[in-house]
């Protein structure tokens, strides 16, 4: 799972049983030129540690935060990977790994498939996975099939426009994307704007260098301004999910990624706002 901050890696049996997991930092310097080399080194290191030869490894799957074509190619630059993209990731990584088969998919799409296969959505035919991390990703499965779309961009819900008056630019180059409000970076950005707009309001985050986790922690501890930001974020995300529900009518939404670790301080207002916006049969 290649993210903007870390790459999370797992060693699995072919039955889907997780044997071990670890992570390595994502080096996005120099337009991400070290990303695949570092991934290959991490995989090879674990293979050596476990005494695994290349022929004993069935394959390697990589989830990337952007569109993917034909389970091989990342056709555009990924907004949260420092300009990295436009690669035949499968071919390049396979070569680095001595010919091991490599398949590539959008991170949220493969997360959704994993949840339907072995996780929270096991048995579901239609579900939507939302990943809240450095960016916002989405994986949409309808009647058992991933919605890839014509250009591999199906489910890119982080780039749904939720504010057409936004002047700040998203990493994708557009304005007013969901990712600008509901990702970890978006929460920090919006919290800073709220602090600037309310200079006389007390807030435990004022004057500090904070992360999204700190905003949720402050809201949980009773900080009114932080709670206001969390509610705004939940409202924006709830509206986006309601719009997706009206289009795909999923059996469930699954929320993952680092921001989801906030727990009930996020999910309680999110469910409330979703119900406010959702079509009554969804």
Describe the function of each predicted region.
Residues 141-156:
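Short, charged low-complexity linear segments at domain edges
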Residues 66-68, 79-81, 108, 152, ...:
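Short, flexible active-site-adjacent loop segments at beta-strand->alpha-helix junctions, enriched
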Residues 73-85:
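A charged helix-plus-loop insertion that forms the helical arch/lid used to bind
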Residues 1-5, 131-135, 153, 258:
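A short acidic Gly-Thr/Ser loop motif
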Residues 22-24, 79, 150:
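Short hydrophobic alpha-helix segments
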Residues 2-59, 68-74, 93-101, 114-124, ...:
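ATP-binding/phosphotransfer module of carbohydrate and carboxylate kinases, centering on a glycine-rich
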Residues 61-65, 105, 129-135, 139-141:
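Short beta-strand segments
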